[in-house]
Protein backbone atom coordinates (compact mmCIF):
# COMPACT_ATOMS: atom_id res chain seq x y z
CA UNK A 1 0.00 0.00 0.00
CA UNK A 2 2.86 2.35 0.85
CA UNK A 3 4.45 1.75 -2.57
CA UNK A 4 1.15 2.33 -4.34
CA UNK A 5 0.71 5.67 -2.58
CA UNK A 6 4.28 6.74 -3.42
CA UNK A 7 3.79 5.69 -7.04
CA UNK A 8 0.51 7.58 -7.28
CA UNK A 9 2.05 10.77 -5.89
CA UNK A 10 4.99 10.48 -8.31
CA UNK A 11 2.71 9.87 -11.31
CA UNK A 12 0.62 12.90 -10.38
CA UNK A 13 3.81 14.96 -10.12
CA UNK A 14 4.80 13.68 -13.58
CA UNK A 15 1.40 14.82 -14.86
CA UNK A 16 2.05 18.21 -13.25
CA UNK A 17 5.40 18.35 -15.07
CA UNK A 18 3.69 17.54 -18.38
CA UNK A 19 1.22 20.37 -17.80
CA UNK A 20 4.09 22.70 -16.91
CA UNK A 21 6.13 21.68 -19.96
CA UNK A 22 3.28 22.36 -22.38
CA UNK A 23 2.06 25.52 -20.59
CA UNK A 24 5.59 26.94 -20.68
CA UNK A 25 5.68 26.27 -24.42
CA UNK A 26 2.47 28.23 -24.88
CA UNK A 27 3.82 31.07 -22.74
CA UNK A 28 7.27 31.18 -24.35
CA UNK A 29 6.61 30.20 -27.98
CA UNK A 30 2.86 30.45 -28.49
CA UNK A 31 2.30 26.77 -29.30
CA UNK A 32 1.31 23.67 -27.36
CA UNK A 33 3.82 21.51 -29.25
CA UNK A 34 7.23 22.03 -27.61
CA UNK A 35 8.78 19.23 -29.67
CA UNK A 36 8.48 21.17 -32.95
CA UNK A 37 11.81 22.04 -34.60
CA UNK A 38 13.12 25.58 -34.84
CA UNK A 39 12.51 26.83 -31.31
CA UNK A 40 15.02 29.19 -29.73
CA UNK A 41 15.83 26.87 -26.86
CA UNK A 42 17.19 24.10 -29.10
CA UNK A 43 19.93 24.38 -31.65
CA UNK A 44 19.24 23.36 -35.28
CA UNK A 45 18.63 19.65 -35.36
CA UNK A 46 18.68 19.29 -31.56
CA UNK A 47 15.74 17.52 -29.93
CA UNK A 48 13.78 18.89 -27.01
CA UNK A 49 13.51 15.46 -25.42
CA UNK A 50 16.89 15.56 -23.60
CA UNK A 51 15.59 18.56 -21.65
CA UNK A 52 12.37 16.72 -20.84
CA UNK A 53 14.37 13.67 -19.77
CA UNK A 54 16.55 15.76 -17.46
CA UNK A 55 13.46 17.40 -15.92
CA UNK A 56 11.90 13.99 -15.31
CA UNK A 57 15.17 12.74 -13.81
CA UNK A 58 15.33 15.72 -11.45
CA UNK A 59 11.73 15.18 -10.40
CA UNK A 60 12.42 11.49 -9.79
CA UNK A 61 15.45 12.38 -7.66
CA UNK A 62 13.40 14.81 -5.58
CA UNK A 63 10.65 12.22 -5.14
CA UNK A 64 13.17 9.58 -4.05
CA UNK A 65 14.75 11.88 -1.46
CA UNK A 66 11.28 12.85 -0.18
CA UNK A 67 10.19 9.22 0.12
CA UNK A 68 13.27 8.43 2.22
CA UNK A 69 12.33 11.16 4.70
CA UNK A 70 8.81 9.83 5.32
CA UNK A 71 9.88 7.18 7.80
CA UNK A 72 7.77 4.06 8.15
CA UNK A 73 4.42 5.82 8.12
CA UNK A 74 2.02 6.23 5.26
CA UNK A 75 3.18 8.86 2.74
CA UNK A 76 1.15 12.04 2.72
CA UNK A 77 0.70 14.61 -0.10
CA UNK A 78 2.47 17.41 1.76
CA UNK A 79 3.23 20.79 0.22
CA UNK A 80 6.83 20.68 1.45
CA UNK A 81 7.49 17.67 -0.81
CA UNK A 82 6.30 19.69 -3.81
CA UNK A 83 8.90 22.35 -2.97
CA UNK A 84 11.71 19.80 -2.68
CA UNK A 85 10.71 17.94 -5.87
CA UNK A 86 10.59 21.04 -8.07
CA UNK A 87 13.78 22.40 -6.50
CA UNK A 88 15.59 19.14 -7.29
CA UNK A 89 14.29 19.31 -10.86
CA UNK A 90 15.68 22.82 -11.42
CA UNK A 91 19.01 22.00 -9.74
CA UNK A 92 19.51 18.94 -11.97
CA UNK A 93 18.85 21.06 -15.09
CA UNK A 94 21.35 23.67 -13.90
CA UNK A 95 23.98 20.99 -13.22
CA UNK A 96 23.39 19.42 -16.64
CA UNK A 97 23.86 22.79 -18.32
CA UNK A 98 27.05 23.40 -16.33
CA UNK A 99 28.73 20.05 -17.01
CA UNK A 100 27.67 19.57 -20.67
CA UNK A 101 27.50 23.18 -21.77
CA UNK A 102 28.61 22.48 -25.34
CA UNK A 103 26.08 19.69 -25.93
CA UNK A 104 23.10 21.04 -24.01
CA UNK A 105 21.36 24.36 -24.45
CA UNK A 106 17.99 25.58 -23.24
CA UNK A 107 15.97 28.73 -22.67
CA UNK A 108 16.11 29.72 -19.01
CA UNK A 109 12.75 31.45 -19.42
CA UNK A 110 11.26 28.19 -20.66
CA UNK A 111 12.66 26.17 -17.76
CA UNK A 112 11.58 28.80 -15.22
CA UNK A 113 8.04 28.84 -16.63
CA UNK A 114 7.98 25.03 -16.58
CA UNK A 115 9.06 25.00 -12.93
CA UNK A 116 6.47 27.60 -11.87
CA UNK A 117 3.55 25.86 -13.58
CA UNK A 118 4.71 22.42 -12.42
CA UNK A 119 4.92 23.68 -8.86
CA UNK A 120 1.42 25.21 -9.07
CA UNK A 121 -0.02 21.99 -10.53
CA UNK A 122 1.75 19.88 -7.87
CA UNK A 123 0.29 22.08 -5.13
CA UNK A 124 -3.15 21.80 -6.73
CA UNK A 125 -3.26 18.01 -6.84
CA UNK A 126 -2.00 17.91 -3.24
CA UNK A 127 -4.70 20.36 -2.16
CA UNK A 128 -7.35 18.18 -3.83
CA UNK A 129 -5.97 15.05 -2.15
CA UNK A 130 -5.83 16.74 1.25
CA UNK A 131 -9.43 17.97 0.89
CA UNK A 132 -10.63 14.38 0.50
CA UNK A 133 -10.67 11.84 3.34
CA UNK A 134 -7.29 10.12 3.37
CA UNK A 135 -7.16 8.97 6.95
CA UNK A 136 -4.93 6.13 8.10
CA UNK A 137 -6.93 3.57 10.14
CA UNK A 138 -5.17 2.72 13.40
CA UNK A 139 -5.98 0.51 16.39
CA UNK A 140 -4.24 1.67 19.56
CA UNK A 141 -3.03 -0.86 22.13
CA UNK A 142 -2.39 1.24 25.23
CA UNK A 143 -3.64 2.50 28.59
CA UNK A 144 -2.41 6.08 27.96
CA UNK A 145 -5.59 8.16 27.70
CA UNK A 146 -3.73 11.40 26.87
CA UNK A 147 -2.04 9.86 23.84
CA UNK A 148 -5.35 8.39 22.70
CA UNK A 149 -7.07 11.79 22.99
CA UNK A 150 -4.28 13.52 21.08
CA UNK A 151 -4.42 10.98 18.25
CA UNK A 152 -8.22 11.10 18.08
CA UNK A 153 -7.93 14.84 17.51
CA UNK A 154 -5.09 14.59 14.98
CA UNK A 155 -5.76 15.04 11.26
CA UNK A 156 -5.56 12.20 8.74
CA UNK A 157 -5.87 9.35 11.22
CA UNK A 158 -8.91 7.30 12.21
CA UNK A 159 -8.71 5.52 15.55
CA UNK A 160 -10.85 2.48 14.75
CA UNK A 161 -10.38 0.88 18.17
CA UNK A 162 -8.55 1.23 21.49
CA UNK A 163 -7.51 -2.16 22.83
CA UNK A 164 -6.66 -3.01 26.43
CA UNK A 165 -3.14 -4.51 26.49
CA UNK A 166 -4.10 -6.70 29.47
CA UNK A 167 -7.42 -7.88 28.07
CA UNK A 168 -8.14 -11.61 28.10
CA UNK A 169 -11.11 -11.27 25.73
CA UNK A 170 -10.31 -11.67 22.02
CA UNK A 171 -10.66 -8.33 20.16
CA UNK A 172 -13.10 -8.06 17.30
CA UNK A 173 -12.02 -8.09 13.64
CA UNK A 174 -10.30 -4.96 12.33
CA UNK A 175 -10.78 -3.39 8.87
CA UNK A 176 -8.20 -4.42 6.29
CA UNK A 177 -5.31 -1.97 6.08
CA UNK A 178 -5.50 -1.09 9.77
CA UNK A 179 -2.21 -0.42 11.56
CA UNK A 180 -1.83 -1.74 15.11
CA UNK A 181 -0.01 0.88 17.21
CA UNK A 182 1.50 -0.95 20.18
CA UNK A 183 2.48 0.72 23.45
CA UNK A 184 5.85 -0.93 24.06
CA UNK A 185 5.72 -0.05 27.75
CA UNK A 186 2.47 -1.92 28.29
CA UNK A 187 2.34 -5.39 29.86
CA UNK A 188 0.50 -7.69 27.46
CA UNK A 189 -1.76 -10.53 28.47
CA UNK A 190 -1.10 -13.85 26.76
CA UNK A 191 -4.27 -13.61 24.59
CA UNK A 192 -3.33 -10.08 23.50
CA UNK A 193 0.25 -11.12 22.67
CA UNK A 194 -1.16 -13.99 20.60
CA UNK A 195 -3.60 -11.62 18.88
CA UNK A 196 -0.78 -9.25 17.89
CA UNK A 197 1.31 -12.15 16.57
CA UNK A 198 -1.56 -13.55 14.50
CA UNK A 199 -2.40 -10.07 13.18
CA UNK A 200 1.19 -9.67 12.02
CA UNK A 201 1.01 -13.02 10.21
CA UNK A 202 -2.29 -11.95 8.64
CA UNK A 203 -0.63 -8.92 7.05
CA UNK A 204 -1.54 -6.14 9.49
CA UNK A 205 1.22 -3.62 10.13
CA UNK A 206 2.47 -3.49 13.74
CA UNK A 207 4.18 -0.25 14.75
CA UNK A 208 5.31 1.36 18.01
CA UNK A 209 2.68 3.72 19.35
CA UNK A 210 5.25 6.48 19.89
CA UNK A 211 6.19 6.45 16.18
CA UNK A 212 2.56 6.77 15.10
CA UNK A 213 2.06 9.52 17.67
CA UNK A 214 5.05 11.52 16.43
CA UNK A 215 4.06 11.25 12.77
CA UNK A 216 0.48 12.36 13.26
CA UNK A 217 0.89 15.01 15.98
CA UNK A 218 4.37 16.43 15.34
CA UNK A 219 5.14 15.96 19.03
CA UNK A 220 7.24 13.72 21.25
CA UNK A 221 5.37 11.71 23.87
CA UNK A 222 7.29 12.75 26.98
CA UNK A 223 5.49 10.12 29.06
CA UNK A 224 7.20 7.47 26.93
CA UNK A 225 10.70 8.90 27.17
CA UNK A 226 13.27 7.34 29.45
CA UNK A 227 16.73 8.35 30.53
CA UNK A 228 19.05 7.73 27.61
CA UNK A 229 16.37 8.42 24.96
CA UNK A 230 18.83 10.71 23.20
CA UNK A 231 20.92 7.63 22.42
CA UNK A 232 18.17 6.66 19.98
CA UNK A 233 18.04 10.22 18.65
CA UNK A 234 20.40 10.63 15.68
CA UNK A 235 22.09 13.73 17.12
CA UNK A 236 25.50 12.70 15.79
CA UNK A 237 24.01 12.31 12.33
CA UNK A 238 22.72 15.88 12.50
CA UNK A 239 26.13 17.42 13.25
CA UNK A 240 26.81 17.89 9.53
CA UNK A 241 23.35 19.35 9.07
CA UNK A 242 23.87 21.72 12.00
CA UNK A 243 27.13 22.94 10.45
CA UNK A 244 25.38 23.53 7.13
CA UNK A 245 22.52 25.19 8.96
CA UNK A 246 24.96 27.63 10.55
CA UNK A 247 26.25 28.62 7.10
CA UNK A 248 22.69 29.15 5.86
CA UNK A 249 21.83 31.19 8.97
CA UNK A 250 24.71 33.58 8.37
CA UNK A 251 24.09 33.83 4.62
CA UNK A 252 20.38 34.59 4.97
CA UNK A 253 21.01 37.07 7.78
CA UNK A 254 23.59 38.95 5.70
CA UNK A 255 21.19 39.04 2.74
CA UNK A 256 18.41 40.37 4.98
CA UNK A 257 20.66 42.94 6.68
CA UNK A 258 19.97 45.95 4.37
CA UNK A 259 16.19 45.65 4.74
CA UNK A 260 16.52 44.85 8.45
CA UNK A 261 18.59 48.00 9.02
CA UNK A 262 16.01 50.22 7.31
CA UNK A 263 13.09 48.66 9.21
CA UNK A 264 15.12 48.73 12.41
CA UNK A 265 15.73 52.46 12.17
CA UNK A 266 12.02 53.16 11.65
CA UNK A 267 11.04 50.90 14.56
CA UNK A 268 13.72 52.47 16.78
CA UNK A 269 12.26 55.93 16.14
CA UNK A 270 8.69 54.71 16.78
CA UNK A 271 9.62 53.06 20.09
CA UNK A 272 11.47 56.15 21.34
CA UNK A 273 8.56 58.45 20.42
CA UNK A 274 5.92 56.15 21.94
CA UNK A 275 7.33 55.75 25.47
CA UNK A 276 10.22 56.63 27.73
CA UNK A 277 13.19 54.31 27.96
CA UNK A 278 15.71 52.66 25.62
CA UNK A 279 14.54 51.32 22.27
CA UNK A 280 16.60 48.13 22.58
CA UNK A 281 15.79 45.70 25.38
CA UNK A 282 18.50 43.33 26.62
CA UNK A 283 17.74 40.17 28.53
CA UNK A 284 19.68 37.07 29.63
CA UNK A 285 18.56 33.84 27.94
CA UNK A 286 19.74 30.25 28.04
CA UNK A 287 21.18 28.85 24.83
CA UNK A 288 22.85 25.73 23.52
CA UNK A 289 24.50 23.64 26.20
CA UNK A 290 22.93 25.77 28.95
CA UNK A 291 25.16 28.74 28.11
CA UNK A 292 23.73 32.14 29.05
CA UNK A 293 23.80 34.90 26.45
CA UNK A 294 22.35 38.39 26.01
CA UNK A 295 19.31 38.53 23.74
CA UNK A 296 18.35 41.77 21.98
CA UNK A 297 14.80 42.90 21.22
CA UNK A 298 12.97 46.11 20.54
CA UNK A 299 11.36 47.15 23.81
CA UNK A 300 7.63 46.43 23.75
CA UNK A 301 6.80 47.04 27.43
CA UNK A 302 7.04 50.03 29.69
CA UNK A 303 10.54 50.65 30.97
CA UNK A 304 11.23 48.57 34.10
CA UNK A 305 8.45 46.04 33.43
CA UNK A 306 10.66 43.21 34.67
CA UNK A 307 11.73 44.98 37.88
CA UNK A 308 9.84 42.39 39.95
CA UNK A 309 11.62 39.48 38.27
CA UNK A 310 10.86 37.19 35.34
CA UNK A 311 7.18 36.84 34.46
CA UNK A 312 5.26 35.05 31.74
CA UNK A 313 4.01 37.39 29.04
CA UNK A 314 0.21 37.39 28.72
CA UNK A 315 -2.03 37.63 25.66
CA UNK A 316 -3.28 41.07 26.72
CA UNK A 317 -0.34 42.08 28.89
CA UNK A 318 -1.02 45.47 30.58
CA UNK A 319 2.71 46.23 30.48
CA UNK A 320 2.71 46.49 26.68
CA UNK A 321 3.10 49.91 25.06
CA UNK A 322 1.03 50.98 22.05
CA UNK A 323 3.87 50.42 19.59
CA UNK A 324 4.92 47.30 21.48
CA UNK A 325 1.51 45.72 21.01
CA UNK A 326 1.82 46.16 17.23
CA UNK A 327 5.42 44.93 17.15
CA UNK A 328 4.48 41.78 19.03
CA UNK A 329 1.55 41.18 16.75
CA UNK A 330 3.85 41.01 13.72
CA UNK A 331 6.93 39.84 15.66
CA UNK A 332 9.03 42.77 14.51
CA UNK A 333 10.24 43.21 18.08
CA UNK A 334 12.57 40.28 17.42
CA UNK A 335 14.35 41.96 14.49
CA UNK A 336 17.49 42.83 16.55
CA UNK A 337 17.95 39.12 17.20
CA UNK A 338 19.48 38.86 13.74
CA UNK A 339 22.58 40.14 15.54
CA UNK A 340 22.29 37.15 17.89
CA UNK A 341 22.14 34.91 14.81
CA UNK A 342 25.35 36.43 13.42
CA UNK A 343 27.05 35.99 16.80
CA UNK A 344 26.07 32.33 16.93
CA UNK A 345 23.76 32.67 19.95
CA UNK A 346 20.70 31.82 17.87
CA UNK A 347 19.75 29.96 14.73
CA UNK A 348 16.94 31.15 12.48
CA UNK A 349 14.96 28.01 13.43
CA UNK A 350 15.05 26.24 16.78
CA UNK A 351 13.41 26.16 20.22
CA UNK A 352 12.84 29.65 21.59
CA UNK A 353 15.32 30.53 24.38
CA UNK A 354 13.96 31.03 27.88
CA UNK A 355 15.15 33.18 30.78
CA UNK A 356 17.61 31.40 33.12
CA UNK A 357 15.25 31.65 36.11
CA UNK A 358 12.52 29.85 34.18
CA UNK A 359 15.02 27.25 32.95
CA UNK A 360 16.09 26.48 36.51
CA UNK A 361 12.46 26.14 37.59
CA UNK A 362 11.39 23.94 34.67
CA UNK A 363 14.50 21.76 34.82
CA UNK A 364 13.43 20.69 38.31
CA UNK A 365 9.74 20.17 37.59
CA UNK A 366 9.56 19.05 33.94
CA UNK A 367 11.32 15.83 32.84
CA UNK A 368 13.76 16.20 29.94
CA UNK A 369 13.31 19.98 29.80
CA UNK A 370 17.06 20.62 29.49
CA UNK A 371 17.26 18.42 26.39
CA UNK A 372 15.90 21.33 24.34
CA UNK A 373 19.35 22.89 24.87
CA UNK A 374 21.04 20.19 22.77
CA UNK A 375 20.82 22.57 19.80
CA UNK A 376 20.90 26.32 19.24
CA UNK A 377 17.67 28.13 20.09
CA UNK A 378 15.97 29.97 17.24
CA UNK A 379 14.12 33.06 16.12
CA UNK A 380 11.15 30.84 15.35
CA UNK A 381 10.47 27.20 16.00
CA UNK A 382 8.21 24.17 15.69
CA UNK A 383 6.48 24.94 19.00
CA UNK A 384 5.85 28.57 18.00
CA UNK A 385 4.03 27.70 14.78
CA UNK A 386 2.01 24.87 16.35
CA UNK A 387 1.11 26.01 19.85
CA UNK A 388 1.41 29.77 20.26
CA UNK A 389 1.17 31.17 23.79
CA UNK A 390 2.67 29.51 26.86
CA UNK A 391 1.76 31.45 29.99
CA UNK A 392 2.12 28.72 32.64
CA UNK A 393 3.95 25.49 33.33
CA UNK A 394 1.26 23.29 31.77
CA UNK A 395 1.58 25.15 28.47
CA UNK A 396 5.36 24.92 28.73
CA UNK A 397 5.09 21.12 28.96
CA UNK A 398 2.92 21.08 25.83
CA UNK A 399 5.41 23.25 23.96
CA UNK A 400 8.25 21.01 25.11
CA UNK A 401 6.67 18.08 23.25
CA UNK A 402 7.06 20.10 20.04
CA UNK A 403 10.58 21.29 20.89
CA UNK A 404 11.82 17.75 21.53
CA UNK A 405 10.18 16.58 18.30
CA UNK A 406 12.24 19.22 16.47
CA UNK A 407 15.43 18.16 18.29
CA UNK A 408 14.84 14.58 17.17
CA UNK A 409 13.64 15.24 13.61
CA UNK A 410 15.42 18.46 12.59
CA UNK A 411 15.99 18.58 8.84
CA UNK A 412 16.00 21.07 5.94
CA UNK A 413 12.43 20.06 5.06
CA UNK A 414 11.19 20.72 8.59
CA UNK A 415 12.96 24.10 8.64
CA UNK A 416 11.30 25.07 5.34
CA UNK A 417 7.94 24.04 6.79
CA UNK A 418 8.54 26.18 9.88
CA UNK A 419 9.62 29.19 7.79
CA UNK A 420 6.48 28.99 5.68
CA UNK A 421 4.21 28.67 8.68
CA UNK A 422 6.08 31.48 10.47
CA UNK A 423 5.12 33.81 7.63
CA UNK A 424 1.49 32.88 8.25
CA UNK A 425 2.02 33.43 11.97
CA UNK A 426 3.30 36.95 11.28
CA UNK A 427 0.41 37.75 8.94
CA UNK A 428 -2.27 36.30 11.21
CA UNK A 429 -0.78 37.26 14.58
CA UNK A 430 -1.28 33.71 15.91
CA UNK A 431 1.12 32.88 18.69
CA UNK A 432 2.75 36.31 18.75
CA UNK A 433 4.37 36.56 22.14
Feature locations, PLM:
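Juxtamembrane loop-helix boundary motifs flanking transmembrane segments in multi-pass membrane proteins
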Residues: 3, 67-75, 232-243, 315, ...
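N-terminal hydrophobic signal-anchor/signal peptide
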Residues: 1-16, 20, 124-261
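Membrane-cytosol interface motif
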Residues: 82-86, 136-153, 278-301
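Signature of alpha-helical transmembrane segments in polytopic membrane proteins
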Residues: 1-131, 433
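A short, structured surface patch at a secondary-structure boundary
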Residues: 314-376, 418-422, 426
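Short, glycine-rich, amphipathic interfacial segments at transmembrane boundaries or analogous
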Residues: 213-214, 220-221, 226, 280-322, ...
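A hydrophobic, helix-centered structural microdomain
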Residues: 241-305, 340, 417-433
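C-terminal terminal-structure detector
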Residues: 368-433
Amino acid sequence: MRRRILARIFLLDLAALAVGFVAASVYTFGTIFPWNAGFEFVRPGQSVFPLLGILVGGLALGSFVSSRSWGAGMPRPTYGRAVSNVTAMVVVVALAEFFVRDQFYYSRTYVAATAVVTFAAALLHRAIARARPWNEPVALITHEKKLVEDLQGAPHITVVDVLDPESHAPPGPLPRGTTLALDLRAVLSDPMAQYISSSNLAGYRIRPLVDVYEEHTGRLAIVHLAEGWELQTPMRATQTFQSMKRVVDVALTVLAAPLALVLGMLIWIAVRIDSRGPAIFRQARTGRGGRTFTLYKFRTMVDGADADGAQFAQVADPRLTRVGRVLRKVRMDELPQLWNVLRGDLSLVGPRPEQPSFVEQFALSIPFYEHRHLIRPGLTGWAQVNYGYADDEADTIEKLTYDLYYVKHMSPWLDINIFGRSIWTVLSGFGAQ
